[in-house]
Amino acid sequence: MNEKYAALKSNVSMLGHLLGNTIQEAHGDEILEKVETIRKLSKSARAGNQADRNNLIEEIKSLPDEQLTPVARAFNQFLNLTNIAEQYHTISRHCDAHVCEPDAINTLFAKLGQNGINKLDTAQAIRELNIELVLTAHPTEITRRTMINKLVKINECLSKLELSDLSYKERHKTEKRLEQLIAQSWHSDVIRKQRPTPLDEAKWGFAVVENSLWEAVPDFLRELDEKLKDYLDQGLPIDARPVHFSSWMGGDRDGNPFVTHTVTREVLLLSRWKAADLYLKDINELISELSMTKCNDTVRQLAGEDEHEPYRAILKQLRTLLSDTKEILDAKINGQKLAVKAPLQSVEQLWDPLFACYQSLRECGMSMIAEGSLLDTLRRVKAFGVHLVRLDIRQESTRHADVLSELTRYLGIGDYNHWSEQDKIAFLTNELASKRPLLPRDWQPSEQVKEVLDTCKIIAAQSREAFGAYVISMAKTASDVLAVHLLLQESGCPYRMDVCPLFETLDDLNNAEAVIKQLMSIDLYRGFIQNHQMVMIGYSDSAKDAGVMAAGWAQYHAMEALVNVAEQEGIELTLFHGRGGTIGRGGAPAHAALLSQPPKSLKGGLRVTEQGEMIRFKLGLPDVAVNSFNMYASAILEANLLPPPEPKQEWRDLMEVLSQVSCEAYRSVVRGEPDFVPYFRQATPELELGKLPLGSRPAKRNPNGGVESLRAIPWIFSWSQNRLLLPAWLGAGEAIQYSIDKGHQALLEEMCREWPFFSTRLGMLEMVYLKCNSEISRYYDERLADKSLLPLGDRLRDQLQSDIKAVLNVENNENLMQSDPWGQESIRLRNIYIEPLNMLQAELLYRTRQAGVVSEALEEALMVTIAGIAAGMRNTG
């Protein structure tokens, strides 16, 4: 490690030493010595010592079954501790200047000033700032809630140890606490033994809100308010809500039979219970603080004329409201059929009395008190509402069509699924305009159809505040959207929900503009949506379908076309980005990704999925979450106030060529290579992943299908485990080399310099290339694949090396990620610890496949390696 990372190096070393002590106490010297031997051999092998690479392989092969789990756990834990140390380093006092970049908002304000942007325009853009982060479950996030809480506490210890004025006693006490936490982590199950239920996943999401976001939101808004006062001489409006949250956990039923209407109902109840619980803690804190006696007439009226401490009197009323709400929701969660509703139903019930207290304190000369904890609670009320997070519902388009098909057959008017698109639209618009009900009372629908209708009834029974959007996956046509509106209407839904088509495949992205245009041509629909349309752009399935380069261009194209349609039609458009943590699923550093979008595509704000493992890395600690909010806010403001250039026509023309060539190259392997599927199944842990309890959702949409039916997550995840990361690069470098050979190098270099969309693509590829490891991939092949399949693996690795040269050539760089030394260092730091896990995993796969039966010990060791590699690879799961 370079000395410029001295503080990080010191923390990593200390945590490693404490982990070593724990391992020694738990397992004795033999295991610790094995771990140390493997670590040293790995370090030497990374430095190019081939003899030590061979020794490392032999050392791992010689491990008896009973030693595999503790050795794997050692490297797994070390990677988790390294992640904590690195995450902490980005917010620590000793953070290196080039790691902790200057404050994103202040940097932006300076840039806006230099570019002569009017401050009134800036103030308006900030008032319109709208960041909605949608928390989604993720099978690769197998870190249990228990472990996450310990990780937060370890972070707190690192923060204390950084204080220079600690006494010997305080330092010793903190170090002891750190050692205890590491020991607790070691002796706890790091991995779930059973597949999590959708309810478990929802609780995981609530834990993130409680442990981090609850504190981070008011902190971020307080900081933003101060920056605005400095730059614009006006603060943030008190009711501003620039950041808010939705969730898919318990609402995403696409291909997940375990998310039923009853699960959704329970998650909605739990969400409200958790919100009431957190507000209750805030209110109790405020009761102890607001002991003042002086107040205005409004507060006197609310508190009662005889109350000596009026603020406390109002807060005690809120305490009763929240306690009663918790009690009733608790009873409902536990299955009691209560006719009574929970008393807390709307945001106004919290906001109005708290805001009255705030205004009174300010009017009575106590602004300093008003701007403290009370303001934080008011900010939370706006951000989290009474539901904590709004729930999205997601369902696959054919499930809605099947409801209508079964219904039309019952009514004797034909089979909806066999009708033309024109006939479907005519039927749907007629029924939407009709005042009579469509569903017959005596109709007994099949179980699957009943489930869809029951979900719609759950939506109808809740307030609008409870929900974000109804997302239609695999949306292809205008009728897919109209069908959901009709089913919601027939279920008695009293409000208009955002019905959001998700365009996922290459063809669907290319067709998105036509679908939205068709919807806008229907007057009835225009009335329904009240001038606002949300559209979701699918990143993962489009990349799985066509490769990252073609998918990236199709996404850009679709966004650009949709923005134009919205402008022509005079509607507000919100683009919802279904990005994952990985490059193959659209992941990129947030700031760069947002600035690489088409001009005007962020006018309607940002709505983006944050998934499992990325939630922890970007939002898992309050200070880290504040940094993430700052990055999002500055990128959106910059994109709207200093929009990126419109791409030149010759850039577009070349992107069309790159897209076509890369798609053909990608599909020629994934679809056209006869050995590809057997190679994929043998050289990666794909088959084993499907059997492990990694998430509530099955790995395949269709249990009998091949690669095309695999979900995007296991598809990417399998390749990231064996370090070939194939979906994240295949086709892209080949297309770039093709264009160089055709004489377009100068144009490619210009695009790289001047077009954020293109330079971000190449930057993402560089990061992937640095995380790939051809030697490890070859080792998996040699240990696990039939000899007849080895030439395919060699060809793919040769292609990888050629692609790296092509990208570096266009960027005029000698080394990967040379413009991001911190990113480079971060990846290198982990490699020493990931490689032993890779070799252990290959060995475990070999032993389990040879035996044909997986013993409990081997299965646990395998899961530990999977979790460890995921932790080490960071955004490649």
From Swiss-Prot:
Superkingdom of source: Bacteria
Names of required cofactors: Mg(2+)
Active site, per annotation: 138, 544
Keywords annotated in UniProt: Carbon dioxide fixation, Lyase, Magnesium
Molecular function GO labels: magnesium ion binding; phosphoenolpyruvate carboxylase activity
Enzyme category, top tier: lyase
Keyword Electron transport applies: no
GO cellular component terms, A-Z: cytosol
Listed EC numbers: 4.1.1.31
InterPro entries hit by this protein: PEP_COase, PEP_COase_bac/pln-type, PEP_COase_Lys_AS, PEPCASE_His_AS, Pyrv/PenolPyrv_kinase-like_dom
Biological process, per Gene Ontology: carbon fixation; oxaloacetate metabolic process; tricarboxylic acid cycle
Catalytic activity field: oxaloacetate + phosphate = phosphoenolpyruvate + hydrogencarbonate
Function: Forms oxaloacetate, a four-carbon dicarboxylic acid source for the tricarboxylic acid cycle.
Family affiliation: Belongs to the PEPCase type 1 family.
Name assigned to this protein: Phosphoenolpyruvate carboxylase
Species the sequence originates in: Vibrio vulnificus (strain CMCP6)
Taxonomic classification: Bacteria, Pseudomonadati, Pseudomonadota, Gammaproteobacteria, Vibrionales
